[in-house]
Amino acid sequence: MLLPVIMAGGTGSRLWPMSRELYPKQFLRLFGQNSMLQETITRLSGLEVHEPMVICNEEHRFLVAEQLRQLNKLSSNIILEPVGRNTAPAIALAALQATRHGDDPLMLVLAADHIINNQPVFHDAIRVAEQYADEGHLVTFGIVPNAPETGYGYIQRGVAVTDSAHTPYQVARFVEKPDRERAGAYLASGEYYWNSGMFMFRAKKYLSELAKFRPDILEACQAAVNAADNGSDFISIPHDIFCECPDESVDYAVMEKTADAVVVGLDADWSDVGSWSALWEVSPKDGQGNVLSGDAWVHNSENCYINSDEKLVAAIGVENLVIVSTKDAVLVMNRERSQDVKKAVEFLKQNQRTEYKRHREIYRPWGRCDVVVQTPRFNVNRITVKPGGAFSMQMHHHRAEHWVILAGTGQVTVNGKQFLLSENQSTFIPIGAEHCLENPGCIPLEVLEIQSGSYLGEDDIIRIKDQYGRC
C-alpha cells in the first residue's frame, strides 16, 4: 500500500486576496465543494493507500484537521513544521516518522495545491511508478508539456528503462526555469517534461540517499523527530531544533545527485494553479471566455476572471481582467499581469496591513469568527461554534464582552457559575472574569460578540484550560 505524503505548506501569495498567510490557497474551495487539499486526497480514491500524512505549518493545524475530518480521513499523521525549510527536510520528516517502528512504506509525495483533471491517467502513472519505486528507484513525475512555459523547471529524460510503451526514463538532468526561446526548444525536442514536484520512493531509500548527499539535513531532521511531541492529534516538531536545519529543495538535495532517479511521464491535464491567469486557464468558461464565481455579472465582456465573495460585481465592456472581491479587499488587474500580485502583498507587509495575513473571517478549532466591525475601543464579531466546540476557559485583563445568542444553545461559564442561553438571550463578561462558551447542541451556535476595552489584542487572552491544547 502507498503512504500519501501531502505537502501543505506555502502561502500562495499570487492568489491574493483570496489566499492569505493564515488561509493559503491549498485550503480554498476554488472548484466545487472541496478544497484543493481535499481534492488532492480524494483524487487517490480507488488506489490502495494508507491514511494520508500531511505536513503543514503549525499555524494551519486546525484548518488541516478540520478539512481531513470532513473527509473522514483525520488521523494523528499531521506533522507541524514550526518554520518552513523547503521540500527536502519536509519529506525527511515524513520518512523518519513513517519508519519509526521499522516500517518502510512506499511514499507518494504530492503537493496539496495541484489540479489533475484526468484521474484515470494519473492512477495509471502511479501504478507504473509503484513498480519502479518498489525496485529501489526514486521516481519523479514529469508533466508532458503543451506550451513553452517559462514558469516551471524542466526535467530532461535520458534512456528508457525498458522497451515497454509505459516505460519510465532515467533522469538526464533537471533544468531551471528557462527563457521563452529555450522553453520552445525544449517543447520541440520532445525530450523534456515540466517538473511537477511529485515523487514516489521507499522511505528508507530516500533517507539513505539523503544521508549520502546531505547528511546535515538528515541529522537535523532526525534530531527534530526524536524530540517531537507526538500528541494525540498532531506531531509537533520543536522550533529550536528544526530552525537549524538547512533550507533545501528535494531536487537540489537528492534528485539531481542520485544515480537512481527515473521520470514517469504524466499527461493528465495538470496545473499547479500558480496565478489567477492559470486559474482562468483551467476553469470552465462561458461563450465569451469569462469565468464567473460567486455573485458576478458581465455584459459585453470577454476573457475575464471574476470571483466575488459576497458583493455583487458587475463588469461591462471589459476584457482580459481579473476581478476578485473579498470582504476586506478587491483586486483588479490585467490578466497578463498575474505575476505582479506579489507586489501588492509586499506593499501590504511593508505598511503593516493585516490584509496580507488573514481574512476578516478567522477560523478556529471550535468554529469561526467573522470580524464585522473593528475599532481601537470596540469590536463586533459574529461567531459560529460548531457542535461540541468550546472556547478555552480564559480571561482578559483589558476588555469586557457581551454575548447575544442568535441561533442554537450555548453553555456559558463565568467565574465558576454555569448556565444555558438560547436564542435572543444574552450575557455580560466583566474584565478579569474567567469564562467559557460551549456548544452542547447538534446544530451550529451563532453568537454576536461585542468586545470593549482599552486594549483588544489577541495577546490579552489568558488561557486557563483548553480542549485543543493551546494553553
Swiss-Prot record:
Superkingdom field: Bacteria
Keyword line: GTP-binding, Lipopolysaccharide biosynthesis, Nucleotide-binding, Nucleotidyltransferase, Transferase
InterPro entries: GMPP_N, Man1P_GuaTrfase/Man6P_Isoase, Man6P_isomerase-2_C, ManC/GMP-like_b-helix, Mannose-6P_isomerase_type2, NTP_transferase_dom, Nucleotide-diphossugar_trans, RmlC-like_jellyroll
Catalysis performed (reactions): alpha-D-mannose 1-phosphate + GTP + H(+) = GDP-alpha-D-mannose + diphosphate
Pfam families listed in its UniProt record: ManC_GMP_beta-helix, MannoseP_isomer, NTP_transferase
EC class (word): transferase
Pathway where this protein functions: Nucleotide-sugar biosynthesis; GDP-alpha-D-mannose biosynthesis; GDP-alpha-D-mannose from alpha-D-mannose 1-phosphate (GTP route): step 1/1; Bacterial outer membrane biogenesis; LPS O-antigen biosynthesis
EC number: 2.7.7.13
GO annotation, biological process: GDP-mannose biosynthetic process; O antigen biosynthetic process
Claim: Cell cycle is one of the keywords in the record: no
UniProt xrefs under CDD domains: cupin_PMI_typeII_C, GDP-M1P_Guanylyltransferase
GO MF annotations, alphabetized: GTP binding; mannose-1-phosphate guanylyltransferase (GTP) activity
Functional note: Involved in GDP-mannose biosynthesis which serves as the activated sugar nucleotide precursor for mannose residues in cell surface polysaccharides. This enzyme participates in synthesis of the LPS O9 antigen.
Other remarks in the entry: There are two duplicated genes for manB and manC in this E.coli strain.
UniProt family annotation: Belongs to the mannose-6-phosphate isomerase type 2 family.
Name assigned to this protein: Mannose-1-phosphate guanylyltransferase
